[in-house]
Amino acid sequence: MNQAIQFPDRETWDDENLAVCFPALVHGMQMMCAIEGATLVRRFGDGLPLDLFREHRWDLEEEASDVIRAGEEDDQGWFWLC
C-alpha cells in the first residue's frame, strides 16, 4: 500500500451525482474520489451501491490510487473511477 495515499472509511452516497463519494488523503491533503452507482452495479452485479463499494473497497481504493497518481482529476478537482 502506498502510505502517501490513504482512504478513511467515510464513503457516502451522493443523490445529486448518483455516486459513492469517498475521500483520499494525499500527503495529508484531502481529495475527493467518486464512482457512479451504475458503474458499481455494472461491475459487481445487483446490490446497493454503498454495499457494493464496501464489499470491493480494496480494489476500488487501489484503482483510485492509480487515478490520483496519474493526475486524472475533473474540472472540479474530483477523481472519478470509470
Which ranges hold each PLM region?
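Glutamate identity and glutamate-enriched acidic tracts
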Residues: 11, 16, 36, 61-63, ...
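A short, structured beta-strand/loop element
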Residues: 16-44
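Acidic, low-complexity intrinsically disordered segments
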Residues: 2-4, 46-82
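Short, charged/polar N-terminal "headpieces" of proteins
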Residues: 1-23
